[in-house]
């Protein structure tokens, strides 16, 4: 059989059976990436990940663009579960300090359960031109926590201007504390969460936060997010 006849019959370069579903294939690649990160560590290379998946690097690049794109895809997967879990701490009938503790504890639980993946996501994998707050995991958390703080400041009748600044400052505190704890686990998770809560809540009360809620105070649109008021 000639090459031309094989092409006409559609047998060149295609395995038998139906073509793989693109989304299913993408999820399989993400699973392989997570296995490689957990095995090698947060500095796992695209070559490590391709080897784990049994593929060549060009296939990874075709699906994710580059390592930053892969990190963004992994962050998107975790955000789907982690962000709602953290924000749910503010939907209870507990006092605001307990809400803050619950949110911090939920995040630290993720760090404790998957430390290598956590470090992969926050260690500048976004590329040299991407700032800390522009990384997918950090940026989304920062904006949503800012909404919570803005509602609390508005309820207290004080300036809501610093809400986003304070949100990212809180994130920096918790992320740095988590990083320190991974490297130097000299205290229990409960103690770590208690100390972080004391530090964060002390700053919030000094700033006038009276109540906390994951929802904007006025309807579904947080006007202050664009005006800065």
Give residue spans per PLM region.
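Alpha-helical DNA-contacting segments of helix-turn-helix folds
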Residues: 37, 64, 71-78, 121, ...
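Helix-turn-helix
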Residues: 28, 39-69, 73
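Short secondary-structure transition hinges
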Residues: 102, 109-147, 157-158, 183
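Amphipathic alpha-helical packing segments from all-alpha helical-bundle domains
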Residues: 129-154, 164-176, 191-194, 198-202
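Secondary-structure edge/capping motif, primarily at the C-terminal ends of alpha-helices
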Residues: 86-93, 121-125, 177-185
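Generic hydrophobic, amphipathic alpha-helix propensity
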Residues: 24-33, 49, 74-78, 82, ...
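N-terminal intrinsically disordered/low-complexity leader segments
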Residues: 1-24, 157-158, 208-229
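Hydrophobic alpha-helical connector segments
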Residues: 73, 87-116, 170, 193
